[in-house]
Amino acid sequence: MTSESYITKLYFKKYFLILFPIAVLISTIGFILCFFVFQDNTTLCILTNIITTLSIIISIAVPALLAYTDKIKGKKAFEIFRTEGFTCKFCDAYRKIYIDKGNPFPLHVIMCASYYGKISEHDTARILLNKIRNPKKLDSYSRFMYYLEMLSMCGKTGNWCKGEEVRKKNIGFLQNYVRKHKNNPELRVNMDIALALIDSAHGHYGDAFTLLNSGYKPKDKNDENFLNILINAVYIYSLAKNDDNLSTAIINAETFLKNFTAFDFPWCKKYYEEQIIRASQGKL
């Protein structure tokens, strides 16, 4: 699910930058009015401080309230996600809450596309991603996620030509973003997987495996990043019709999954089992 703290940050970035200058303007107008209405300096100072304080409180409270409202709205979708996982029901609920009404944050649109992609609704994912008209104007995290989802969607649908275009134009940004956030290895893993999907769609299976074998080591036996690498290896061997290595890749993924001792949600084990099966059939 989309990070609540990051969504809160986006609300503050969007509305505080609008409301704070208005607050300053109101304070200035209030000072001028008080200056002409009240000649007493003490009264003038008190009223000016009150107006300034209220203006600042409003400029902070409004984005905070909107972020809280966003969180409340998302409870229904999160409850479906918590109990059922990535399902059409969850994706539709998320879309209804965040996308179909009002002016959604681009990050909500991108994440909704990602969720549809996880249930192989790639046409819907493409429609949603096409709503983002100018990704270079997004904040860096949203922009990074947008390119990952575009690459992933193009790779899974075989549209390597469009994927290579996205890759060529934005690989510098993607690599720089990963370097700046090297304390978050999940970003590097997801980037390498997305790029590997483009290579595999183009038939460059060796390049795809070079990306998957970029040196990431599992941090423990419950490492979902490493499991995703193994599942995508199954998928790429299936596309390459390399049956011997496919059998080994399936065993590797199933064995690593069996060693898991903890999942974030009860449905995760079954979800990953199904992903391994689908990947072995050349589907993701």
Predicted regions and their residues:
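"A position-specific structural signal for the A-helix of alpha-solenoid helical repeats
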Residues: K75-K76, L107-Y115, S142-M153, L187-A201, ...
